[in-house]
């Protein structure tokens, strides 16, 4: 595997955050008129209860650093290897970009709609994502690598997504984010000696924000049944596979990050998939068969393809570009074969909302 490119300056951190690749977090824009037309009257009781939870803001005091934070960084993180340092910094840059992406999207929606239900929801979620992004960025500043988030908002490319794509992708992003954070938190709770950075102490209450955000999109989707039935299930299937595959490949580019926490990347990812599959039964009548032999083989092949693409890119020149194109085509073919693997089907529960019980 090629060495992870180093992040040693704020300029490199900003460049990494602005990247637009298949694996990097993106910034989105959407159809605000369609967002304004969202109708949640069919799930009004659950919706109002959820907004009351946002109003209660049980994490309002959570994203504050303790006096011991910087001291723990100095004592514990100084002992990590250069390779782990770079993988962790890459994780922080990717995470702050992802959190800020949600902040930007939700804020733009709330500014461009009049629908009071949508406006209130987006304002609350933008508030939460702003806290998350700011907390991660503060951790980057400890290394002199803080990112100018205002500049990132102005200069990073935006991708247009129809509202239904926003719902599918963001629901899954929030729920898989919960599954990732809670799995890491539980692991380090059992093995505190492997907590090499204090930010992981915040993950339990933090991931409950992610879970609640996902609940919001679950309610929207269940209030519009046509989005989770018929031909739209083909899109659900696509986004399930795309989100899982992106996570799997990205995580396997950071093997030392998981190893340092006492996790193995493949085992960790399938635990996250399992949790996300269970959660997503609240809204999707299908789930990926993550135990299917062809699914697991396909994931491994996508990792190999990514390594080959990176090697071709590093080679450069005409030959390198041709190799990149060939391996990209191989990756697309692998994804297509995985898309055709039979899915598991199940009935939707009468009650939409769930508790974060993992």
Curated annotation (Swiss-Prot):
Instruction: List the InterPro entries.
Output: AcsF, Ferritin-like_SF, Rr_diiron-bd_dom
What are the entry keywords?
A: Bacteriochlorophyll biosynthesis, Chlorophyll biosynthesis, Iron, Metal-binding, NADP, Oxidoreductase, Photosynthesis
Reaction(s) this enzyme catalyzes, per UniProt: Mg-protoporphyrin IX 13-monomethyl ester + 3 NADPH + 3 O2 + 2 H(+) = 3,8-divinyl protochlorophyllide a + 3 NADP(+) + 5 H2O
Question: Do the record's keywords include Oxidoreductase?
Answer: yes
Concerning Pfam families, the annotation shows: Rubrerythrin
Effect of knocking it out?
No phenotype under photosynthesis or low-aeration respiratory growth conditions. In contrast, under highly aerated respiratory growth conditions, the absence of AcsF leads to an accumulation of MgPMME.
Q: Which enzyme class? A: oxidoreductase
Q: What is its EC number?
A: 1.14.13.81
Cofactors per UniProt? Answer: Fe cation
Q: Which biological pathway?
A: Porphyrin-containing compound metabolism; chlorophyll biosynthesis
What is the name of this protein? Aerobic magnesium-protoporphyrin IX monomethyl ester [oxidative] cyclase
Source species of the chain: Rubrivivax gelatinosus (Rhodocyclus gelatinosus)
Specify the taxonomic lineage. Bacteria, Pseudomonadati, Pseudomonadota, Betaproteobacteria, Burkholderiales
């Amino acid at each position: 595997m090629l060495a992870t490119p180093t992040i040693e300056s704020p300029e490199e951190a900003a460049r990494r955050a602005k990247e637009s690749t298949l694996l990097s977090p993106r910034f989105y824009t959407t159809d605000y008129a369609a967002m304004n037309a969202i109708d949640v009257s069919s799930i009004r009781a659950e919706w109002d209860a959820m907004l009351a939870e946002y109003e209660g803001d049980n994490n309002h005091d959570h994203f504050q650093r303790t006096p011991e934070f910087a001291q723990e960084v100095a004592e514990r993180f100084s002992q990590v290897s250069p390779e782990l340092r770079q993988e962790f910094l890459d994780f922080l840059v990717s995470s702050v970009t992802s959190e800020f992406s949600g902040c930007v999207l939700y804020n733009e929606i709330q500014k461009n709609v009049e629908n009071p239900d949508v406006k209130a929801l987006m304002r609350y979620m933008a508030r939460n994502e702003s806290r998350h992004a700011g907390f991660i960025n503060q951790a980057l500043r400890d290394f002199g690598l803080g990112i100018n988030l205002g500049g990132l908002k102005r200069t990073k490319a935006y991708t247009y997504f129809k509202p239904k794509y926003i719902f599918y992708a963001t629901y899954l992003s929030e729920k898989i984010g919960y599954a990732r954070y809670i799995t890491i938190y539980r692991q380090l709770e059992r093995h505190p000696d492997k907590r090499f950075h204090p930010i992981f102490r915040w993950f339990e209450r933090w991931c409950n924000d992610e879970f609640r955000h996902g609940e919001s999109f679950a309610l929207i989707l269940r209030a519009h049944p046509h989005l989770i039935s018929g031909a739209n299930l083909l899109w659900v299937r696509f986004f399930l596979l795309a989100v899982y595959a992106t996570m799997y490949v990205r995580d396997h580019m950071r093997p030392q990050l998981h190893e340092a926490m006492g996790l193995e990347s493949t085992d960790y990812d399938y635990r996250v998939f399992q949790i996300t599959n269970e959660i997503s039964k609240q809204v999707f009548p299908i789930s990926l068969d993550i135990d299917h032999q062809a699914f697991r083989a396909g994931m491994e092949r996508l990792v190999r393809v990514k390594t080959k693409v990176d090697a071709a890119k590093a080679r450069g020149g005409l030959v390198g570009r041709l190799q990149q194109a060939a391996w990209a085509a191989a990756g697309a073919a692998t994804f297509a074969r995985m898309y055709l693997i039979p899915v598991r089907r199940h009935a939707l529960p009468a009650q939409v909302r769930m508790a974060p019980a993992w």
